[in-house]
Amino acid sequence: MPLFTATELIPKGQRFVALANSQTYSTRTAGAILNEAARAESTARAFDIFLAHAYLDATLVAGLKADIEEMGFSVYVDWIQDSHLDRAKVDKATVELLRMRLKQSTSLFFATSDNSSTSKWMPWECGYFDGAKGKVAICPIAAQGALSEFAGQEYLGIYPYIQKDR
């Protein structure tokens, strides 16, 4: 079975990003209103999957989220559900919010990519979730082509990895 590929995910992610960026027609856009509603709704919501990822892969992650949701799962991505978070100002409130989101999630997918090794949060999220619930899987994103095998960082080898059914 093949892995998720950047070639497939980028167009989906670009559509999401374009839609989010196009909503600038007023000082309080429909997107802002929807984000507020989603934030209020999602504080009590459960998610099937917490998607740990590198923010540098935002377009890929948006496409991956869309792909997984098309399979019928709910997916938490911090900068989508909690767009008010300030990446330049990480504090205790940020950590508490992420802990709450991890607790609200049934499983964690660790999205590996060329950028994932630079993330400071991904190992923390993975370790926290593994200790709390143990339902962690690696979700490799192949840079190109339809690779069918994954070999990741050492400690990631203890987890199963996700393959995409075709």
Predicted features, each with a name:
Residues 1-104:
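Conserved N-terminal substructure of TIR/SEFIR domains
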Residues 52, 109-113, 139-140:
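Conserved beta-strand segments of the P-loop GTPase G domain that flank and frequently precede/overlap
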Residues 71, 104-107, 132-136:
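Short glycine-/polar-rich loops that comprise or flank the Walker A/P-loop
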Residues 81-83, 114-115, 140-147:
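Short beta-alpha junction loops
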Residues 90-93, 125-126, 152-154:
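Short low-complexity, flexible loop/linker segments enriched in glycine and/or proline
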Residues 102-116:
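Extended, charge-rich low-complexity interaction segments
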Residues 114-132:
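Conserved TIR/SEFIR loop-to-helix hotspot centered on a Trp-containing motif
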Residues 138, 143-163:
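Glycine-rich, charge-decorated loop segments at or immediately adjacent to ligand/cofactor-binding or catalytic sites
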